[in-house]
A protein has these predicted regions:
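Short, Lys/Arg-enriched N-terminal segments with co-localized hydrophobic residues
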Residues: 1-5
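C-terminal structured subdomain/cap of oxidoreductase catalytic cores
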Residues: 45, 144-149, 153-168, 175-176, ...
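Substrate-recognition/cap regions that form aromatic- and gly/pro-loop-enriched pockets
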Residues: 292-408
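Glycine-rich N-terminal segment of FAD-binding domains in flavoprotein oxidoreductases
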Residues: 17-112, 121-127, 351, 403
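C-terminal substrate-binding/cap subdomain adjacent to the FAD-binding core in PCMH-type
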Residues: 138-330, 345
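Solvent-exposed alpha-helices and their adjacent loops that cap or buttress functional pockets
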Residues: 19, 38, 56-57, 74-77, ...
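Structural signature of FAD isoalloxazine-binding scaffolds in flavoprotein oxidoreductases
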Residues: 54-73, 127-147, 173-180
């Protein structure tokens, strides 16, 4: 077994948001035999590509990485069904399937997640309906605590199946997943961006959702009972020209020192972040393209593959929670007042209409999901306590796959 023991003087960021650091022992099993030997250990977690925002990928003792389990086991191009080991990255799946006329039916905001991580977190995307990966999974193979390989489907070993999707590895180690793909004619996306300047206009614009496949909403400002931002809608281009089924040409870049320095200033300053959001909203509609590339639409944050570094050594935390529609305006106004009074801010606030049934640890319910990226600074503790008070007051469901601030209550 290949062991990496982190040096005690070096703190290692265990999640993408960089808000928790430790020096764990990390094991990279190369095959099933080595993995079974490790399963006899206690107090460890399974990790994929460690792109989680929250603390669900954190263990200060032992981490078992599935990065060596990176084979695509089967791809049926005719039926649009793929089976891949849990360590395979989504970007590698897309590189294989998109040029043949298929795409994943649900995708998070980054291609650099592992298949096992997508299942364990039951990822959701911009889809207006069937918004979670659970709707498209056909079969899972799990190595349980007894070192038995369990095959489960929606009808076979159903409890294992339902508990594993969104279960954060509590049922065992996900070995592979088989899921249904979505047929596409092009990697191009038809998109529409509409500006809203009030709650009424926001709700009115959302009525257009049935004309599209995807929607996400970006908040620029919310204050004194008002709200401003942009609604993004999209659907796959139906042009049947085969030349549009081409490989990705999206070139990722790393943030260099100069850009890092400038961006860090903007992500740490209350007034500059407000100015940036205002400028973005005003000019985005002018320069946006009616037809967008696949990567531009689904993975804009991957343009800078190390964008998380702009928050500095303390990192940030992402709060994502689900509020009922009748409480939405009240909660947004309370958050706005808190941010204004404390001169604190969220660099991004994303709102999405949400309607999912579920159970166990899954993120489900009906209403609006609110997602905020908040830099960790001197106001962190006060912000955390405020959000927890909101969670409790309104009995709000928190997305555990991204959470690192919710208290036990």
């Amino acid at each position: 077994i290949h062991l990496i023991i982190m040096k005690s003087q070096s703190n290692f960021s265990l999640n993408w948001s960089g808000n928790t650091k430790a020096t764990p022992r990390i094991i990279y099993p190369k095959n099933l035999e080595e993995l079974k030997k490790i399963m006899a250990e206690k107090n460890f977690i399974i990790a994929g590509n460690q792109r989680s925002f929250g603390d669900n990928s954190i263990n200060t003792n032992l981490i078992v990485s599935m990065k060596n389990f990176k084979q695509v086991l089967n791809f049926d191009k005719a039926k649009g069904i793929i089976e891949a080991q849990s360590g395979v990255l989504l970007k590698d799946v897309l590189g294989l399937i998109v040029e043949t006329g298929w795409c994943v039916p649900v995708t998070p905001g980054s291609k650099y997640v592992s298949i096992g991580g997508m299942v364990a977190n039951n990822v959701h995307g911009k889809n207006i309906t069937n918004n979670q990966i659970k709707h498209h999974i056909l079969e899972l193979k799990i190595l349980n605590e007894n070192n038995e390989i369990v095959t489960c489907t929606p009808t076979q070993n159903k409890n294992y199946f339902e508990s594993t999707i969104g279960g954060f590895g509590l049922t065992g180690c996900i070995l592979s997943a088989k899921f249904r793909l979505k047929k596409i004619n092009s990697i191009l996306m038809n998109q529409e961006i509409l500006e809203f300047t009030s709650y009424n206009s926001f709700f009115s614009i959302l009525e257009k959702s049935n004309l599209y496949e995807y929607n996400v909403n970006w908040i620029e400002s919310f204050d004194n009972g008002s709200i401003k931002g942009l609604c993004y809608f999209g659907k796959h281009e139906n042009n049947n020209n085969s030349h549009t089924l081409q490989k990705f040409n999206f070139k990722e870049k790393e943030i260099n020192f100069f850009n890092y320095f400038i961006l860090k200033i903007f992500t740490q300053n209350y007034y500059l972040i407000k100015l940036t959001k205002f400028i973005f909203r005003k000019f985005k509609k002018i320069f946006y393209k009616k037809v967008s590339g696949f990567d531009e639409f689904f993975y804009p944050q991957d343009y800078f593959i190390n964008w998380n570094k702009i928050y500095g050594k303390n990192g940030f935390f992402q709060a994502q929670f689900l509020v009922k529609e009748n409480n939405f305006k009240d909660i947004m106004n309370k958050i706005a007042k808190f941010f204004k009074d404390e001169k604190n801010f969220s660099t991004f606030i994303i709102i999405k209409k949400f309607d999912e049934k579920g159970k166990y640890l899954n993120f489900y319910g009906q209403g609006f999901s609110i997602s905020m990226d908040i830099p960790i600074n001197s106001k962190f503790e006060k912000t955390k306590n405020f959000l927890n008070s909101i969670f409790q007051e309104y009995d709000i469901k928190v997305n555990f796959s991204k959470d690192s601030i919710a208290n036990k209550d």
